């Protein structure tokens, strides 16, 4: 921890913000104090989360410890468990986080990394209906980092990604592609 805060102190006035990402940051013991210390240094904080801890999410937002939240929507509710490798996954915490963020308590975005083996056309409409009215939604092109639990995963072409975005825009007009050239 000292290393992190030393780094941030040296860069005050140079950097504007810090992105706290994971794994899942909200699972960490002491995350609130960590965020408080970053805030004391004057940084804005973006939190990347999968939405599994809605109560902690609400707490850090209401305490003013985060300025922006980016939440992963792994897939449609029907295929969420398959996508994360846990069949019959209980989505109730994810659902609570979605509802909370949609209340506009903090600027936020939802995002989905689109993987050909997990996402079909019907999933995009289902996700869109689920997060309808959201501030921002990003469909991100999957990139194989070579360090995946499951090998052989592929991305869609630019054309298919654009078609998916069009489906979603009916429900979430501010839908944008990321990582697609």
What residue ranges belong to the model's regions?
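Active-site beta-strand/loop signature of hydrolases that rely on acidic residues for catalysis
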Residues: 23
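Conserved AdoMet/S-adenosylmethionine-binding subsite of the radical SAM
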Residues: 2-17, 26-161
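A C-terminal junction/extension of Radical SAM enzymes
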Residues: 162-181
């Amino acid at each position: 921890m000292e290393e992190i805060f030393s780094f941030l102190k040296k860069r005050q006035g140079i950097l504007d913000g810090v992105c706290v990402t994971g794994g899942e940051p909200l699972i960490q013991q002491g995350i609130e104090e960590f965020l408080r210390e970053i805030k004391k240094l004057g940084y804005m904080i973006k939190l990347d989360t999968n939405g599994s801890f809605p109560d902690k999410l609400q707490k850090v937002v209401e305490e003013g410890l985060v300025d922006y939240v980016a939440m992963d929507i792994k897939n449609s509710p029907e295929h969420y468990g398959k996508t994360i490798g846990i069949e019959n996954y209980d989505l109730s915490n994810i659902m609570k986080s979605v509802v909370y963020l949609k209340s506009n308590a903090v600027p936020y975005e939802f995002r989905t990394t689109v993987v050909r083996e997990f996402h079909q056309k019907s999933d995009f409409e289902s996700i869109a209906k689920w997060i309808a009215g959201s501030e921002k939604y990003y469909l991100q092109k999957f990139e194989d980092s070579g360090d995946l639990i499951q090998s052989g995963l592929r991305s869609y072409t630019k054309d298919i990604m654009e078609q998916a975005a069009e489906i979603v825009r009916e429900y979430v007009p501010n839908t944008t592609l990321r990582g697609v050239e």
